[in-house]
């Protein structure tokens, strides 16, 4: 990483305050060498650490994003990224999300994996053995930037856009459902928003977890028992419509429900 630590700390502080106070900041990419992913992840790590130190939140999971070629094409990025899920970011199905807490709320539906043991080896066998159950989930996506997503370093530095997760109503043992063949539909107030199939996510959502496990091991922060892991969007990422009930249904896994409220 060629970026001074004081620059990393300053940018992380700006993103932390933007999230806390709900305002936007300029892209970080002009301040970093082109495609310096190490610097972007260092900023993201300090951003997460600031939340943990100053707000007292705890890490309870991770997300891997940009696993769907539809989403990659939409944002002009060609590789996955990852971020952190803190305990104050986790919601139950049926939750109401105040839009006043977000800059520009976006909606995704995906398969969430919950671990029963640590993952210390990034193999399919080790990952599958560590999974306790799967459930449908919304990722609550929000960025701290003045414009749209920006470059990959902008996305990574901003916790990969992850601002929360809404977990589904049902829990299913891993292997009970063929995740490559599940079909997902999101509706808002009964109107279809997006749809997709499980194979959109790196051909199989568990492949996203394998990728995440390897990345986590390389960075010295392996995935731990109890963590919630978001595997990436099955359909497009779309604006979250206000004041209507949004429902994501994934065949064989059930549904997840949430409403973004313009008041309150």
Language model features: what each stretch is:
Residues 221, 230-232, 236-244:
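Structured functional modules or segments
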Residues 112, 209-210, 230-232:
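Active-site scaffold segments
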Residues 33-34, 214-216, 232-233:
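Short alpha-helix capping/helix-loop boundary micro-motifs
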Residues 187-189, 231, 251:
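Short strand-turn-strand beta-turns centered on an Asx-Gly dipeptide
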Residues 47-48, 167, 209-216:
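Buried hydrophobic packing segments
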Residues 2-204, 241, 245, 255-261:
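Catalytic-core "active-site belt" of small-molecule-metabolizing enzymes
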């Amino acid at each position: 990483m060629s970026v001074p630590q004081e620059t990393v700390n300053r940018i992380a502080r700006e993103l932390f305050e933007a999230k806390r106070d709900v305002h936007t900041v300029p892209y970080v990419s002009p301040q970093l060498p082109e495609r310096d992913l190490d610097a972007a992840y260092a900023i993201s790590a300090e951003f997460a650490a600031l939340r943990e130190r100053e707000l007292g939140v705890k890490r309870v999971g991770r997300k891997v994003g940009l696993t769907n070629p539809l989403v990659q094409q939409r944002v002009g990025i060609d590789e996955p990224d990852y971020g952190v899920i803190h305990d104050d970011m986790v919601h139950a199905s049926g939750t109401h999300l105040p839009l006043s807490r977000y800059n520009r709320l976006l909606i995704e539906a995906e398969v969430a994996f919950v671990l029963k043991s640590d993952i210390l080896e990034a193999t399919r066998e080790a990952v599958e053995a560590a999974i306790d159950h799967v459930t449908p989930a919304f990722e609550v996506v929000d960025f701290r930037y003045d414009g749209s997503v920006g470059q990959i370093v902008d996305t990574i530095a901003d916790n990969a856009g992850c601002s929360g997760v809404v977990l589904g109503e049902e829990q299913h043992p891993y292997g009970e459902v063929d995740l490559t063949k599940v079909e997902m539909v999101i509706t808002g107030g009964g109107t279809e928003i997006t749809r997709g199939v499980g194979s959109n996510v790196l051909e199989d959502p568990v492949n996203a977890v394998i990728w995440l496990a390897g990345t986590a091991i390389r960075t010295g922060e392996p995935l731990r028992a109890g963590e919630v892991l978001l595997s990436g969007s099955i359909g497009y990422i779309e604006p979250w419509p206000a004041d209507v009930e949004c429902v994501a249904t994934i065949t064989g896994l059930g549904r997840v429900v949430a409403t973004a409220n313009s008041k309150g």
